[in-house]
Amino acid sequence: MSKVQEILEAVKSLTVLELAELVKAFEEEFGVSAAAPVAVAAAPAAGAAAAAPAQEEKTEFDVILVSPGAQKVNVIKVVREITGLGLKESKDLVDGAPKPVKEKVSKADAEAIKAKLEEVGATVEIK
């Protein structure tokens, strides 16, 4: 197998977060920006190729508590843990659903917060 094929296989096995780190490392190492070439390459492409740059551009997400579900007390506890709010503020947030629990967080953080809240029975959206 040639070096190029080996590198291609290694890149295929990376997660999305690892690929983002790789792109950032390339940008820093070689003093280039991946934004312009991606936009130029995506312009003539159709469908899926055009959707990829749109996903890459969104780096901040809001976690919205839609409904606390049946285990409201447990949801309040998790909201306190996630936000650092006091008991009253957390209860007000949960009672006022739908409301944002956390805003402008990374996708990984948003997914982790969503998982914690869903684990205790809440309904959550990521926007």
Curated annotation (Swiss-Prot):
Keywords: Ribonucleoprotein, Ribosomal protein. The keyword Ribosomal protein applies. The keyword Ribonucleoprotein applies. GO terms for cellular component: cytosolic large ribosomal subunit. GO terms for biological process: translation. One of its GO terms (molecular function) is structural constituent of ribosome. Pfam families: Ribosomal_L12 (PF00542), Ribosomal_L12_N (PF16320). Forms part of the ribosomal stalk which helps the ribosome interact with GTP-bound translation factors. Is thus essential for accurate translation. Belongs to the bacterial ribosomal protein bL12 family. Homodimer. Part of the ribosomal stalk of the 50S ribosomal subunit. Forms a multimeric L10(L12)X complex, where L10 forms an elongated spine to which 2 to 4 L12 dimers bind in a sequential fashion. Binds GTP-bound translation factors. PANTHER family: 39S RIBOSOMAL PROTEIN L12, LARGE RIBOSOMAL SUBUNIT PROTEIN BL12M. NCBIfam families: L12. This is Large ribosomal subunit protein bL12. It comes from Carboxydothermus hydrogenoformans (strain ATCC BAA-161 / DSM 6008 / Z-2901).
